[in-house]
UniProtKB/Swiss-Prot annotation:
Domain of life: Bacteria
Enzyme Commission number, as recorded: 4.3.1.18
SUPFAM superfamilies documented for this protein: Tryptophan synthase beta subunit-like PLP-dependent enzymes (SSF53686)
Name assigned to this protein: Probable D-serine dehydratase
Entries under InterPro entries matching the protein: D_Ser_am_lyase, Ser/Thr_Dehydratase, Ser/Thr_deHydtase_PyrdxlP-BS, TrpB-like_PALP, TrpB-like_PALP_sf
Keywords: Lyase, Pyridoxal phosphate
Catalytic reaction equation(s): D-serine = pyruvate + NH4(+)
GO molecular function annotation: D-serine ammonia-lyase activity; hydro-lyase activity; pyridoxal phosphate binding
Any one GO BP annotation for this protein: isoleucine biosynthetic process
Length: 444
């Protein structure tokens, strides 16, 4: 972006200066539409989400058969919702300010199969593609027991096809594991941020890992180009895929069921706040869409991004979406939160969700390290740095009077609030890597 254009943009959008200075900030969205109007602009419906849920149910017998870790939930890929009262108390002490309401952790960090939120969207899109191919070939019917897919004849059939994806790590891991299990040939195009252990894991499964010295955007673009050369190759597009988005959206309906089981009330007097780490936007965008369908006006969805990679905040705040990257304003897009190291947000998610997401904030890497150490110490839960990004959200909410006034959130309502921090990854991190994460804050 030319200097002149940037200067003009900064006059119009003064918060850009704060982002350029790598300062932590919170921006609540003044462009929220009434719920039904905003949902209509997404271009997808509750019926689409229910169909995605039904497809996952069809695959459950197969998943339970080939992934023993899913058997306890009968092939359902779902995570626990746990109250983290000790963490809440520790945060209150650390911040010298009581965190009001009840704090919960959604442990997508420990989802079966691939140990991250990407086990939702990534695995779902691979399954949807496999189902389509098998049905078109006359090998599968919707009413079949899908455990039949665990046969050499199906693996041989799928081996004619290739699946490709560009990733900073976790999406590649989810898609690689699932595709390889079904028998597909797989290529994962990985950015410079991707952790070595993730590449090693994929290669051990026979996945073709293509490495780039550049960031996420380049890995996706190169992956897309390579896939175009092969008519038997299906490219999973993290930036634009509605199928991925729907795989994530199922989480909203599932969380509502968990709330009912735990008798957690959500209504006008008992607001729900959900804090989601955001990279390119597909995961948090899809989950938020599902949450808005499930809980309506009473759920507030807030995205958290690293100070070095606030691509969604920048895109939505300026209205430029994928037409602007963090590099355009001079940021380096280098962060310890490798899953969030994205310079340019998804235009599809930004535009679809801009009237639904309630707020966006940024967080320093050092704060992420402190938070994962504190979570480990207080709750004995281990997550990777990016997964802790949502943990500061409740403070931004309760200390921003304009936000509270806009949503008519009284002190009494906040007392009855439920805060859910969506932990997005870390379940598969090798113990020695996790130890490095946990000791980082002590050594600095």
């Amino acid at each position: 972006m030319k200097t002149v254009q940037l200067d003009q943009l900064k006059q119009q959008f003064p918060l850009i200066q704060t982002l350029q200075d790598y300062q932590e900030t919170f921006w609540f969205n003044p462009h929220r539409y009434p719920l039904n109007e905003a949902l209509a602009k997404v271009g997808l419906t509750e019926q689409d989400v229910k169909e995605a849920e039904a497809r996952l149910a069809r695959f459950a017998p197969y998943l339970a058969k080939v992934f023993p870790e899913t058997q306890a939930q009968h092939g359902k890929i779902e995570s626990a919702l746990v109250k983290i009262a000790d963490m809440q108390q520790a945060l209150s002490l650390q911040k010298h300010k009581t965190l009001i309401g009840k704090l919960w952790l959604k442990k997508d960090s420990h989802l079966p199969i691939s140990g991250s939120i990407k086990a939702r969207g990534g695995i779902y899109e691979v399954l949807a593609h496999a189902e389509k191919l098998a049905i078109e070939a006359g090998l599968l019917k919707l009413e079949d027991d899908y455990s039949k897919l665990d046969q050499d004849s199906f693996r041989t059939f799928f081996s004619k096809y290739q699946i490709a994806v560009g990733s900073t790590g976790n999406l590649g891991l989810s898609i690689g594991i699932m595709s390889a299990k079904l028998g597909f040939r797989v290529s994962v195009h990985m950015s410079a941020d991707a952790r070595q252990w993730k590449k090693d894991k994929l290669r051990s499964l026979g996945v073709n890992v293509v490495e780039y010295a550049s960031d996420y955007g380049v890995a996706v673009e190169e992956g897309r180009k390579a896939a175009e050369q092969d008519p038997f190759c299906f490219f999973i597009d993290d930036e634009n895929s509605t199928t991925l988005f729907l795989g994530y959206a199922v989480a909203g309906l599932r969380l509502k069921q968990q709330f009912e089981q735990k008798q957690i009330k959500v209504d006008a007097d008992h607001p729900l706040f959900v804090y989601l780490p955001c990279g390119v936007g597909g995961g948090p965008g899809g989950v938020s869409f599902g949450l808005k369908l499930a809980f309506g006006e009473h759920v507030h969805c807030i995205f958290a991004e690293p100070t070095h990679s606030p691509c969604m905040l920048l895109g939505v705040y300026t209205g430029l979406h994928d037409q602007i990257s963090v590099n355009d304003i001079g940021l380096d897009n280098i962060t310890a939160a490798d899953g969030l190291a994205v310079g340019r947000a998804s235009g599809f998610v930004g535009r679809a969700m801009q009237q639904l997401i309630d707020g966006y904030y940024t967080i320093h890497d050092e704060c992420l390290y402190e938070l994962i150490a504190l979570l480990n110490q207080t709750e004995n839960i281990q997550v990777e740095p990016s997964a802790a990004a949502g943990m500061m959200g409740p403070y931004y909410v309760q200390t921003t009077p304009d936000y509270l006034a806009l949503h008519q959130l009284s002190a009494e309502k906040l007392q009855h609030a439920t805060h859910v921090v969506w932990a997005t990854g870390g379940g598969m991190v090798p113990p020695d890597e996790m130890q490095k994460y946990l000791t980082h804050s002590q050594s600095n």
